[in-house]
C-alpha cells in the first residue's frame, strides 16, 4: 500500500503536503513546531490537520506491520496462494485483513478441526458437489476406531466442517457485517425483575431498542455502563432470515437436492453458533470505539476551551475554597500569583461565624487591595456566595466575585506536585491558592492537574483510558504552545508541555533559573543540562523572555528567523525599540507599499510567504496572548437563588460543559441549566459544538424550573 497516497486521499490533502509532514515527523519534529515553523514545507497545515495525519500514519504503519505478519504466518503454513496474497495486499482496513486471515489463524481445537481429524473433509465436500445419496455416501466414513459409529455421526461431523468454512469465508463475513450494521437493532432490558435505586438511572433503557446505524454515541456509552453494572441486559438483533437466505444463495443450496437439509442445518449452525456471536462482538466494539472517539472529541474540545479561557491579569485575587465543618480556606495572591496571605474562616454551618469571618475577609481585602474573589463551586459554595454577596452590598465595595470550577482541585492539592510547590501549606491552603490562580491564568494552573480530573467530559471513566490520556495530553500540548510561556516564571509542569521539552528538561530549566537567576536570552537555554540543539530548535519559539537582552525573545519569532525579522524592520524603517510602543502594527502596510509589495520582500529576503506573514503578525503585537480574544468570565456582585428563576426570564450565563445532547450553562444559581440540542438554535443542529463551546458567554431563556429535583431547562432560541 502507498501510505502517502492513502493519507492524501483519505484526508483530502496534497501528496506533497503529506510527504513533507511525514518526513518532518520521522525526523523527530513535534506537531506544534511543524504547525508553527514549517508552514512552507507543509503548505500551512495546522496542528489539527497534522494530528489527524499523524494518527492516520500510525494506523497505516501498524496495518502494514500486521499485513507482513499475516503473510509470513500463512506462507510458513504453506497455504499462501497468489490469489490470496493479492487479496491480502489489497486489503485497506484491519477488519478486511483479519477476515482474510481467519481461516489460517492459529486457534484452539474446534468442532471443525475434530471432524477433519476423523477424516470427514471429503464428505463435507461431497455435500457441496452434491452427491445423489448423502446417507449412503456417509456410510463410507463409518469408523469405530475414530468414534464415527453411524452415518448420522459422519454427516454431523461433515456439517461441523461446513459450518466452520462458511463462518471463515471473508466475503460472507463482510456482507453479513455490513447488513447487520445497516439493519441491526441494539436492544436493552432490565436484568433483574424488580427495579432498585441504582437501576433508576437507566429507566429509559428498561425496554429499549434503536437502529445500530443511528444510535448516538452517548447512548452506547450509557448502555455499556448499564451492562457493566449488571443492571441492563444489552443485545443486538440482526435480520436473521435475510442473512440465512443470502448464505444459502451463495452456497447455491436450492440446487443441492437431497443434500439440501444438511446444508441448511450447517448454514443455520454456522450463523447462530459462529458468525452471529462474532459479528455481534465486532459491532459492539465498532459502536463503542466510535462512541469513545466522539466522546473524546467532545472532551478534547471542552478541555481546549477551558485551557484557553481569558486570563485575568494585573489583579490581586482572594481564593475561597468553601466548606462546612472544616471551614472555608482563604488565600490571597498578588498579580503574579505569589501568595500574600492565608487563613481559615467559618461563616457556614455548623459554626455560622459570619460576623467574625467577614471581619477577617474585610481586613484581607483592605490590607492587600483585593480586586476579585475567586469562589470555588464545590460544597458550601452556595452558602459562601450568599455571605460574600451580603458583604459586598453592605460595604458598597467595588470588589467583584467569580465562581470558579474547582474540578480537580482536591486531586491537585493532595498531589506530590502541590506538596513540592507549597511544602509548608496544608491541603486547604493549596486548594484556595489554586482557586485564585485558576482565575488569573487558567492554563498555567490547570496543566498541573491530570486532564481527566478536570471534569468536562461525558462517560470519561468508561472509555479506553490510555487513548483518552494520549488525546487530552495532545490538547494540552497544543494549547500551551499556541499561547507560549514566560521562560522566567513558568512552572516545570507548564514547561513540560512545550514542544521538545521533556519533564526532566523542564525541571532542569527551573533548577538553572533558581541557581543563575532569570534567563536574559533564549540562547542561554543551551546551557541547561540535557537541552541540546534539537530541543532548542523545537522549543525556543514557544518560550518568551520579557525585558531580556534581545527584544525578539518576547515574540513568537523563532531565533532561526531573527536575521530576517531585523531585515524586515530595516526595510520598514522601524527601530526594534519602537515595537514596544506599537509601531510594529504599521509594518505590514509599509512593506506592502514597497516596490513589488510583499512578494518582492519575500524574494529580496529569501523568505517564504507563511513565515513573512507570521513575522509581521508577531511584530505587530509583541508578547500578544491569543487568549485575549476570548470573553472574560462574568464578574458577579449579587446572588441569584434557584427559587428566584421564573419561566421566560432571560439571563446571561457561561457554558460550563458541552455534551452530545446539549450544553450546560451556569446562570449563577449553583445549578447549571441544560440547553437541549433542540433548543440551541432555530436551525437544525447536528452537534452542540457546532453552536457553542465551553466558556462562551450566552443569553438564555428559562423554559422550566424544577426546584425539588434542581433541574433547569433553558433555551437559546428567541433571546
Description of each model-found segment:
Residues 178-186, 320-324, 379-380, 404-411, ...:
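A glycine-rich phosphate-binding loop feature that marks nucleotide/adenosyl-phosphate handling sites
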Amino acid at each position: 500500500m502507498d501510505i502517502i497516497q492513502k493519507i492524501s486521499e483519505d484526508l483530502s490533502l496534497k501528496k506533497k503536503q503529506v510527504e513533507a509532514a511525514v518526513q518532518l515527523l520521522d525526523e523527530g519534529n513535534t506537531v506544534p513546531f511543524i504547525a508553527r515553523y514549517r508552514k512552507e514545507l507543509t503548505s500551512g497545515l495546522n496542528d489539527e490537520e497534522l494530528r489527524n495525519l499523524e494518527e492516520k500514519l500510525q494506523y497505516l504503519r501498524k496495518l502494514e506491520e500486521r499485513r507482513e505478519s499475516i503473510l509470513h504466518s500463512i506462507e510458513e503454513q504453506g497455504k499462501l496462494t497468489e490469489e490470496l496474497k493479492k487479496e491480502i495486499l489489497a486489503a485497506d482496513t484491519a477488519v478486511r485483513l483479519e477476515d482474510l486471515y481467519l481461516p489460517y489463524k492459529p486457534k484452539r481445537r474446534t468442532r471443525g478441526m475434530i471432524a477433519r481429524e476423523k477424516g470427514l473433509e471429503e464428505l463435507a465436500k461431497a455435500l457441496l458437489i452434491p452427491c445423489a445419496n448423502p446417507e449412503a455416501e456417509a456410510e463410507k466414513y463409518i469408523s469405530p476406531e475414530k468414534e464415527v459409529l453411524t452415518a448420522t455421526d459422519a454427516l454431523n461431523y461433515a456439517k461441523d466442517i461446513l459450518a466452520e468454512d462458511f463462518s471463515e469465508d471473508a466475503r460472507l463475513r463482510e456482507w453479513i457485517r455490513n447488513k447487520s450494521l445497516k439493519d441491526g437493532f441494539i436492544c436493552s432490558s432490565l436484568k433483574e425483575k424488580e427495579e432498585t435505586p441504582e437501576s433508576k438511572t437507566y429507566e429509559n433503557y428498561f425496554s429499549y431498542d434503536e437502529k445500530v446505524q443511528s444510535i448516538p454515541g452517548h447512548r452506547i456509552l450509557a448502555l455499556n455502563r448499564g451492562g457493566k453494572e449488571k443492571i441492563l441486559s444489552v443485545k443486538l438483533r440482526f435480520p436473521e432470515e435475510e442473512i440465512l437466505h443470502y448464505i444459502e444463495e451463495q452456497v447455491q443450496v436450492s440446487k443441492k437436492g437431497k443434500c439440501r437439509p444438511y446444508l441448511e442445518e450447517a448454514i443455520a449452525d454456522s450463523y447462530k453458533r459462529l458468525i452471529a456471536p462474532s459479528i455481534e462482538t465486532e459491532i459492539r466494539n465498532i459502536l463503542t470505539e466510535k462512541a469513545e472517539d466522539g466522546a473524546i472529541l467532545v472532551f478534547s474540545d471542552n478541555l481546549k476551551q477551558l485551557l484557553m479561557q481569558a486570563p485575568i491579569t494585573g489583579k490581586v485575587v482572594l481564593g475561597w475554597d468553601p466548606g462546612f465543618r472544616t471551614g472555608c480556606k482563604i488565600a490571597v495572591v498578588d498579580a503574579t500569583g505569589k501568595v500574600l496571605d492565608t487563613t481559615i474562616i467559618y461563616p457556614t454551618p455548623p459554626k455560622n461565624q459570619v460576623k467574625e469571618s467577614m471581619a477577617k475577609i474585610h481586613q484581607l481585602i483592605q490590607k492587600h487591595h483585593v480586586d476579585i474573589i475567586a469562589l470555588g463551586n464545590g460544597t458550601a459554595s452556595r452558602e459562601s456566595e450568599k455571605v460574600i454577596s451580603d458583604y459586598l452590598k453592605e460595604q458598597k465595595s467595588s470588589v467583584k466575585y467569580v465562581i470558579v470550577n474547582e474540578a480537580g482541585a482536591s486531586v491537585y492539592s493532595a498531589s506530590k506536585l502541590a506538596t513540592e510547590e507549597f511544602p509548608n501549606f496544608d491541603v486547604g491552603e493549596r486548594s484556595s491558592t489554586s482557586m485564585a490562580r485558576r482565575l488569573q491564568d487558567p492554563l498555567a494552573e490547570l496543566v498541573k492537574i491530570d486532564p481527566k480530573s478536570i471534569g468536562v467530559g461525558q462517560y470519561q471513566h468508561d472509555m479506553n483510558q490510555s487513548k483518552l490520556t494520549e488525546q487530552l495530553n495532545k490538547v494540552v500540548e497544543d494549547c500551551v504552545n499556541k499561547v507560549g510561556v514566560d521562560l522566567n516564571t513558568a512552572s516545570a509542569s507548564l514547561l513540560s508541555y512545550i514542544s521538545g521539552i521533556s519533564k526532566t528538561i523542564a525541571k532542569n530549566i527551573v533548577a538553572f533559573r533558581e541557581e543563575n537567576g532569570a534567563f536574559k536570552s533564549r540562547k542561554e537555554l543551551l546551557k541547561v543540562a540535557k537541552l541540546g540543539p534539537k530541543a532548542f530548535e523545537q522549543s525556543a519559539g514557544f518560550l518568551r523572555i520579557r525585558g531580556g537582552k534581545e527584544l525578539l525573545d518576547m515574540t513568537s519569532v523563532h531565533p532561526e528567523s531573527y536575521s530576517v525579522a531585523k531585515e524586515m524592520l530595516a526595510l520598514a524603517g522601524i527601530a526594534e525599540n519602537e515595537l514596544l510602543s506599537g509601531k510594529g502594527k504599521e509594518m505590514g502596510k509599509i512593506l506592502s507599499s514597497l516596490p513589488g509589495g510583499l512578494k518582492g520582500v519575500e524574494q529580496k529576503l529569501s523568505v517564504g510567504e507563511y513565515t513573512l506573514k507570521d513575522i509581521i503578525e508577531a511584530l505587530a503585537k509583541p508578547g500578544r496572548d491569543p487568549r485575549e480574544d476570548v470573553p472574560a468570565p462574568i464578574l458577579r456582585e449579587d446572588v441569584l437563588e434557584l427559587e428566584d428563576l421564573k419561566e421566560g426570564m432571560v439571563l446571561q450565563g457561561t457554558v460550563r460543559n458541552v455534551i452530545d445532547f446539549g450544553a450546560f450553562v451556569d446562570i449563577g444559581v449553583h445549578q447549571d441549566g441544560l440547553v437541549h440540542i433542540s433548543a440551541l438554535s432555530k436551525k437544525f443542529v447536528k452537534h452542540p459544538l457546532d453552536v457553542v463551546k465551553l466558556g462562551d458567554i450566552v443569553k438564555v431563556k428559562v423554559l422550566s424550573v424544577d426546584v425539588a429535583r434542581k433541574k433547569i431547562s433553558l433555551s437559546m432560541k428567541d433571546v
